[in-house]
Amino acid sequence: MEKIKVMLDTSAYSAFLRGNAEVNQALQAAEEIYLNPVVLGELYAGFAQGGREKKNKEILREFLASPRVQIAVIDEETAERYAAILTYLWSKGTPIPTNDLWIASTAMQHGLKLITTDGHYRDVPQIIVECCGV
């Protein structure tokens, strides 16, 4: 049986913290959970703007310490996939935010199911998207 590998975007991580049942179920079923540097950057920026920065960083550190959680690398192959997705979405008139392109490209590159609460990822070809709470 193939391992269940998922990637969280920022919205899914936030939903997880809020106790979203669909996201929690997806994470419980996953053997490997990935985030990428873009997601981490968005989280850290959000923490800095909120009133619980220290506590939120501590919670994230605990999450990242799990042996099931890994950081997916962004490299030249990711950039090529980014360009292909962006070109496709432009041609369809359905662009998505730049950071979300990087997240989708990373999921595509590593064959990861993308867990999100953002429905616009459904417009991205060649990735499996599980939209929770959309």
Where are each of the predicted segments found?
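Generic structural signal for small/hydrophobic residues in well-ordered secondary structure
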Residues: 9-10, 43, 82, 107
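Active-site neighborhoods of divalent-metal-dependent phosphate/nucleic-acid chemistry enzymes
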Residues: 70-115
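Alpha-helix capping/helix-boundary segments
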Residues: 12-13, 39, 78, 102-103, ...
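Acidic, PIN/NYN-like endoribonuclease modules and their adjacent C-terminal/linker elements
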Residues: 1-4, 104, 108-134
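Short, hinge-like loop/turn segments at secondary-structure boundaries
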Residues: 50-54, 89-90, 131-134
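A general structural signal for well-ordered alpha-helical segments in protein cores
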Residues: 40, 57-60, 79, 100
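Short, well-structured N-terminal submotif of metal-dependent ribonuclease cores
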Residues: 1-36, 45-62
